[in-house]
């Protein structure tokens, strides 16, 4: 039981556990240190009203998350699972053709990479996208992000102009349900 586990603690360090009134009420918790960059699992309003400070570990995974974003894109764009299976099956060595191109390859260079959320991870992803030769545009769900290196666009424009979209914004009331079916139809 989380409530019992935290009742006598001054500081708790959760990750993914729901930390809300039902957990915190009647406890001696003075600070919640979320062991992640996102903290949508913490009831911020309750904590604020109860005088409980909330922090996270912003920046701890910026490079690795941006790198993983590019790795996932390359896996999809280059059909890596398909081609790895093709080679591992022995079909490549048995083929009389010089090359096997049943699945089309895509170039990132020259594409428009749209980024939803230009915080630290979004900015790092933008740098990597540019290194591959992509033009970067971004949408700021909060309306607070401004960056002179990249063109800021509204959400619909991001959907319509982007060849690639990666999402790096926190899950909150402004972003929950942002990418619904109607958004995908605009892509």
Say what each PLM segment does.
Residues 1-55, 160, 180:
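An N-terminal-biased, well-structured beta-alpha scaffold segment characteristic
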Residues 9-10, 70-73, 151-154:
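Short low-complexity, flexible loop/linker segments enriched in glycine and/or proline
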Residues 41-45, 64-68, 146-150, 163:
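Short, charged, surface-exposed secondary-structure boundary motifs
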Residues 53, 75, 79, 135:
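Residue-level detector of anion-binding/catalytic polar loops
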Residues 53-59, 152-155:
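Short beta-strand elements at the ligand-binding edges of bilobed clamshell
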Residues 58-112:
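Phosphate-binding beta-alpha-beta segment of Rossmann-like dinucleotide-binding domains, i.e.
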Residues 99-186:
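Rossmann-like dinucleotide/phosphate-binding beta-alpha-beta segment
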């Amino acid at each position: 039981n989380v409530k019992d586990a935290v009742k006598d603690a001054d500081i708790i360090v959760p990750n993914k556990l729901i930390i809300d009134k039902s957990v915190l009420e009647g406890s001696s918790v003075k600070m919640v240190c979320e062991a992640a960059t996102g903290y949508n699992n913490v009831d911020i309003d309750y904590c604020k009203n109860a005088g409980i400070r909330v922090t996270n570990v912003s920046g701890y995974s910026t490079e690795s998350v941006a790198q993983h974003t590019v790795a996932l894109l390359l896996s999809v764009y280059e059909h890596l699972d398909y081609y790895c299976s093709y080679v591992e099956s022995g079909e490549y060595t048995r083929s009389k053709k010089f090359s096997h191109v049943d699945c089309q390859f895509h170039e990132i260079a020259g594409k428009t990479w749209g980024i939803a959320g230009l915080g630290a991870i979004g900015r790092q992803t933008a740098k990597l996208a540019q290194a591959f030769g992509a033009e970067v545009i971004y949408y700021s769900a909060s309306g607070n992000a401004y960056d002179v290196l990249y063109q800021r666009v509204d959400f619909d424009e991001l959907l319509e102009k982007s060849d690639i979209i990666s999402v790096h914004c926190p899950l909150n009331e402004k972003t929950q349900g942002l990418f619904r079916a109607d958004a995908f139809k605009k892509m």
